[in-house]
Amino acid sequence: XTEDKTDAATDVATXEAPVGFTPXELDPNTXSXIFG
């Protein structure tokens, strides 16, 4: 259903972390790898 697609998109966005978003759970090195 649509909800499943939304959840999947959210999971991907959270995993990849969009530019400008700095999750406190991820270390600076991890964020650099994602942003870089």
UniProtKB/Swiss-Prot annotation:
Annotated GO biological process: photosynthesis
Gene Ontology CC annotations of this record: chloroplast thylakoid membrane; photosystem I
Major location category of this protein: plastid
Keyword terms: Chloroplast, Membrane, Photosynthesis, Photosystem I, Plastid, Thylakoid
Membrane topology listed for this record: Peripheral membrane protein
Highest taxon listed in the record's lineage: Eukaryota
Compartments it resides in: Plastid, Chloroplast thylakoid membrane
Family: Belongs to the PsaD family.
Its job: PsaD can form complexes with ferredoxin and ferredoxin-oxidoreductase in photosystem I (PS I) reaction center. PSAD may encode the ferredoxin-docking protein.
Protein name in the entry: Photosystem I reaction center subunit II
Native source species: Pisum sativum
